[in-house]
Swiss-Prot record:
Record's compositionally biased regions (Basic and acidic residues): 82-101
UniProt KW Acetylation keyword: yes
Chain intervals for the UniProt region annotation (Interaction with human CREBBP): 1-24
Region annotation Core: where it falls in the sequence: 38-48
UniProt domain comment: The cell attachment site mediates the interaction with ITGAV/ITGB3 and ITGA5/ITGB1 integrins, leading to vascular cell migration and invasion. This interaction also provides endothelial cells with the adhesion signal they require to grow in response to mitogens. The Cys-rich region may bind 2 zinc ions. This region is involved in binding to KAT5.
Listed name of the protein: Protein Tat
Residues noted as binding Zn(2+) 1 in the record, renumbered to the chain: C22, H33, C34, C37
Post-translational modification: Asymmetrical arginine methylation by host PRMT6 seems to diminish the transactivation capacity of Tat and affects the interaction with host CCNT1.
Protein's organism: Human immunodeficiency virus type 1 group M subtype J (isolate SE9173)
Gene Ontology cellular component terms for the protein in this record: extracellular region; host cell cytoplasm; host cell nucleolus
HAMAP family in alphabetical order: HIV_TAT (MF_04079)
Motif (Nuclear localization signal, RNA-binding (TAR), and protein transduction): 49-57
General remark: HIV-1 lineages are divided in three main groups, M (for Major), O (for Outlier), and N (for New, or Non-M, Non-O). The vast majority of strains found worldwide belong to the group M. Group O seems to be endemic to and largely confined to Cameroon and neighboring countries in West Central Africa, where these viruses represent a small minority of HIV-1 strains. The group N is represented by a limited number of isolates from Cameroonian persons. The group M is further subdivided in 9 clades or subtypes (A to D, F to H, J and K).
C-alpha cells in the first residue's frame, strides 16, 4: 500500500478515484466501478435534485367533481317501535313451522 501524502487532499490520494470515467451503463462491472456508481446504480440512491411530476390536467369537457355532489338532508333512521313481547311472539311463530321432528 502506498504511503499517504499529508499535503494532498483526501480525494486526490492515489487510488481514491477510478482511472476511467463513470458511464450510464448499468451492467455489473459498471455498477461496481466506484463508490458513487455503486450507490447510484447498484443501490438506486441518488442525492441529486428530484424532478417534479406534472399533474395530469382534467379533460376540457369534465366538470369539477365537487360540483356534482348535491346537498343531501341528514340521514334519519325510522324504526318501528316494537316491544320485547312482540318480538318474542314473532320469533316463536316463525320457529314452530320449521321444526322437522
Amino acid at each position: 500500500m502506498e504511503p499517504v501524502d499529508p499535503n494532498r487532499e483526501p480525494w486526490n490520494h492515489p487510488g481514491s478515484q477510478p482511472k476511467t470515467a463513470c458511464t450510464n451503463c448499468y451492467c455489473k462491472k459498471c455498477c461496481y466501478h466506484c463508490q458513487v456508481c455503486f450507490l447510484q446504480k447498484g443501490l438506486g440512491i441518488s442525492y441529486g435534485r428530484k424532478k417534479r411530476r406534472q399533474r395530469r390536467s382534467a379533460p376540457p369537457g369534465s366538470k369539477n367533481h365537487q360540483d356534482l355532489i348535491p346537498e343531501q338532508p341528514l340521514f334519519q333512521t325510522q324504526r318501528k317501535p316494537t316491544g320485547p313481547e312482540e318480538s318474542k311472539k314473532e320469533v316463536e311463530s316463525k320457529a314452530e313451522p320449521d321444526r322437522f321432528d
